[in-house]
Each structure stands twice: as structure tokens, then as C-alpha cells.
């Protein structure tokens, strides 16, 4: 039987018809913003490509360390246009890979050092928000990963045991039984959950615009509507109003994440995977009371097809997930931001996990690409001979990691005496993705296999051995 409020064709069949096709986060910041474009020529100390969190945090920390330097950020659209302004609003200390998975690549000590630095990043971001007066609805309520079927409980507890075995503390990751989980939020089905305190909720668009305003006050140039055509040693070639231009720079930092395939240097460094979201109307006090989302911890489940949600500051459920197809040749188009089938599946998850909100109207739906490296591992690349650096590889967990890697690349370039220079991501180069059509076949197979395995496990309570082996080989 489907949850109350759902229909045979899904909760979203009616609700999606009138949903605004833009991020709900954009409703909260309507202050005037003047666009400045790049000059046809010029010279700066640091040129940063990408006006998202990676680029803006890099500009921020360079401006603190070298206030006399000229710094410019190139953005093809407007700041916060990409994933930074339309993500799920999680600022999580977790990487896409767990501590035990990072240990397999870098060793135990390096993995634990990376995680300690990432957990501490939330304190750093919070301190900047307070110091700079950036209002973005910052709220630290932690995060839970809930087991919605018994098989997920076994898997989550087994994975948690691996983390504790290498030295991750109970204070950082611990198990909640079903009653403790329901004390966090009144989920329809839970067999317990992994909890971490290292996660905050934010309005990411407010956060990115707030940071941009601070940068302007600090004298950083933000050049929007100025797409970069090519990166050369010490030169950024761009177009503004259809006219070519070139700006020289002592250092060029590429911070383009999901849009990296459009550059020659990073054609196969990442694939742009689309993550889509919906948001409900503000929920009534009665529904909120039934949900008992007490600390506003973020939510995900233990399935392979990622789903993620938060209760926003104004009482909405903002929920998203993967499942939209990868497009041949790593193509990115505005029309890909909307996918009815995927949005419908995400909207139905509200009724499945949060039945009291099953009748809530869907007011917004949106999506966008995020960058995924072949090994799901972040990296900081510094090439002094080419006056070039690059950061990225967040695999959807970038709101905190962008800050960490921005501080790292600044410390590395300036050769600061900093523990961040011991992070294993410095100099790490992920393998390139396969050429087409192998990439198209492989990535979309991963998406379909993940969905198929989740469906089989929910129906039978058992994991399909052949499909599970296939997906592990593809990864």
C-alpha cells in the first residue's frame, strides 16, 4: 500500500505541475547585485576560474594572506550559478569516501588527518560567517544515515565498525537505535541510524552571495558573464559580450568542478552527474509537530541511490537525489536541470520517509551538475612551472570541502607552515574517466544498477549478488 497522500502515479504528478523551476534558496536573497564583466585585457596576481564556493573561498583566503595582491574571479554566468547556489544545503564534514575508504588509498594516519581537518572546517566556516556578518541560516544539527530496511542496518553497522577500527571516535560517528533515531525525526521506517555531529544546514545561495559581497568589499574583482575559453600558462582567455579578451596572471586557479570537462586540461578529469531536488511549501505547525524533526539533523538513507534531505529554516522539506541520466560527452544543458521522472521519484520519497508531510504542496524543483572524479577523491594540484593550480573533486560533498581545499591551495602556493600542507589530497591525481562511449555506458549502468539493487533489497530483504558484484567492479 502506498503512503497516505501518494497516488498510483506518484505524489508529484499533480504537485509538479505548478512547481517553480528554480532553487528554493533563491527566494531568500533579493538584494540588488551589479554585474561587472572582465576587461578585454589586463594583469592580476591571481586569476580564479569559477564563481562558486571553490573559487570564492580561494579568493577570500588569498585576500587575507596577501591583501596587496590583485585578485580576480571569472564566472561564465553569475556567482553561485552552479552547484554552489543550488545544492542540498548540507555543510558536511564527511567526504564522499569514508575514513576506511580513504585509508585504502592514503593510509590510516593520512585518512584520519584529512577527516580531522574536514571536521574542523565547520568551525572555520562558522567563524567566517560570524566575523563577516554573512547571514545564511547556518544551523548545526548533525546528520543521520537511516537504515530503512534490516539489510541496510547490517551494512551500516558493519561500515561503522570499520571506521571505529581505524580510530574514528564515537564522538564523531555513532550508532542510534530505532528509538533514538525517531527522537531525531519521526521517520516512517527506521531500524537505526549512523549519526555524526559534523554537519550544518545552510541556505547555500545566501552563503555564496554573502561571501561574494565580502570579497567585493575586500577589493577582489568578480567578473561575471565572462566565460573562459582557454587556460594557458599565466593567461586566461575569455569572451565578454562576444568579444575575445586575455588577462595575464601570476597564478591561474581552476575551480570549475562539474564544468571541468569544457576545458582541455580537464576534459576527462570529472563527469558532470546531475543531482535534482524538490522543496515543499512551509509545513504547518501540526505537521512539524508530527515530524518531530527536533534538531533539524540532515537525513539520508542507507540505499545505493542517494537521497538527501533537510528541514529548512522556514519549515520546508528540501529533498534531493541522484538518478537523472548522464549525458553523452559530458554535456551540460539548462534543459537537463529538469527531469520529470527523477523529480517524481524524489517527491514520492517525502511520503515514504515523512508521511505527515505527504500532502504538502511541492513549490520548487530544480537540478544541476556536480563533479565526480573517477576515484571519488578530492585533489589539490599545483604546477609552479605553468603558474597553475586546480582544486575540486567533491562528488556532491563540497560545501565544507571547498573551504578546506581553498585554504590548502593557498597555503601550498604560498608555502605556509601549515598542517594543511600534509593533507593527502595535495598532488593527488585521480585517474581519467574512460573515453566515450564507454563512459556513457558505464556511468548510466551504475545509475540503473544502483536503483535496481535498492528495489530488489527493499522487496526481498536480500542483496542481489551478481548485480552487487557488477557495480563494485564498475566502481
Specify the residue positions occupied by each region the protein language model found:
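Helical element adjacent to the flavin cofactor pocket in flavoenzyme catalytic cores
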Residues: 161-166, 188-250
Amino acid at each position: 500500500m502506498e503512503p497516505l497522500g501518494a497516488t498510483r502515479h506518484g505524489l508529484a504528478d499533480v504537485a509538479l505541475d505548478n512547481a517553480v523551476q528554480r532553487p528554493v534558496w533563491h527566494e531568500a536573497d533579493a538584494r540588488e547585485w551589479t554585474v561587472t564583466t572582465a576587461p578585454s585585457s589586463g594583469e592580476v596576481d591571481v586569476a580564479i576560474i569559477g564563481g562558486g564556493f571553490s573559487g570564492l573561498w580561494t579568493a577570500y583566503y588569498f585576500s587575507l594572506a596577501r591583501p596587496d595582491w590583485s585578485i580576480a574571479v571569472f564566472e561564465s554566468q553569475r556567482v553561485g550559478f552552479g552547484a554552489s547556489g543550488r545544492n542540498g544545503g548540507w555543510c558536511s564534514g564527511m567526504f564522499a569516501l569514508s575514513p576506511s575508504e580513504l585509508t585504502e588509498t592514503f593510509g590510516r594516519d593520512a585518512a584520519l588527518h584529512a577527516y580531522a581537518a574536514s571536521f574542523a572546517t565547520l568551525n572555520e566556516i562558522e567563524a567566517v560567517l560570524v566575523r563577516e556578518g554573512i547571514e545564511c541560516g547556518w544551523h548545526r544539527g548533525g546528520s543521520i544515515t537511516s537504515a530503512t530496511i534490516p539489510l541496510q542496518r547490517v551494512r551500516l553497522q558493519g561500515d561503522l565498525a570499520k571506521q571505529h577500527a581505524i580510530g574514528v571516535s564515537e564522538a564523531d560517528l555513532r550508532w542510534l537505535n530505532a528509538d533514538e533515531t525517531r527522537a531525531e525525526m519521526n521517520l516512517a521506517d527506521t531500524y537505526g541510524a549512523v549519526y555524526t555531529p559534523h554537519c550544518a544546514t545552510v541556505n547555500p545561495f545566501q552563503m555564496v552571495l554573502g561571501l561574494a559581497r565580502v570579497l567585493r568589499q575586500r577589493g577582489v574583482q568578480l567578473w561575471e558573464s565572462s566565460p573562459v575559453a582557454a587556460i594557458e600558462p599565466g593567461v586566461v582567455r575569455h569572451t565578454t559580450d562576444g568579444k575575445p579578451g586575455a588577462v595575464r596572471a601570476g597564478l591561474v586557479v581552476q575551480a570549475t568542478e562539474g564544468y571541468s570537462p569544457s576545458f582541455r586540461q580537464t576534459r576527462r578529469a570529472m563527469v558532470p552527474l546531475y543531482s535534482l531536488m524538490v522543496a515543499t511549501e512551509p509545513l504547518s505547525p501540526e505537521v512539524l509537530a508530527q515530524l518531530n524533526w527536533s534538531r533539524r539533523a540532515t537525513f539520508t538513507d542507507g540505499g545505493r541511490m542517494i537521497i538527501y534531505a533537510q528541514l529548512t529554516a522556514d519549515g520546508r522539506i528540501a529533498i534531493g537525489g541522484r538518478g537523472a541520466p548522464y549525458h553523452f560527452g559530458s554535456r551540460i544543458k539548462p534543459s537537463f536541470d529538469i527531469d520529470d521522472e527523477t523529480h517524481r521519484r524524489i517527491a514520492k520519497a517525502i511520503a515514504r520517509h515523512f508521511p505527515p508531510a505527504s500532502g504538502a504542496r511541492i513549490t520548487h524543483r530544480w537540478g544541476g551538475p556536480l563533479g565526480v572524479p573517477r576515484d571519488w577523491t578530492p585533489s589539490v594540484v599545483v604546477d609552479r612551472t605553468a603558474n597553475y593550480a586546480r582544486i575540486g573533486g567533491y562528488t556532491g560533498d563540497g560545501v565544507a570541502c571547498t573551504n578546506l581545499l581553498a585554504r590548502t591551495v593557498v597555503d601550498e602556493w604560498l608555502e605556509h607552515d601549515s598542517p594543511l600542507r600534509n593533507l593527502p589530497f595535495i598532488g593527488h591525481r585521480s585517474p581519467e574517466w574512460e573515453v566515450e562511449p564507454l563512459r556513457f555506458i558505464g556511468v548510466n549502468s551504475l545509475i540503473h544498477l544502483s536503483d535496481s539493487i535498492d528495489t530488489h533489497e527493499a522487496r526481498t530483504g536480500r542483496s542481489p549478488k551478481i548485480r552487487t558484484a557488477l557495480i563494485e567492479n564498475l566502481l
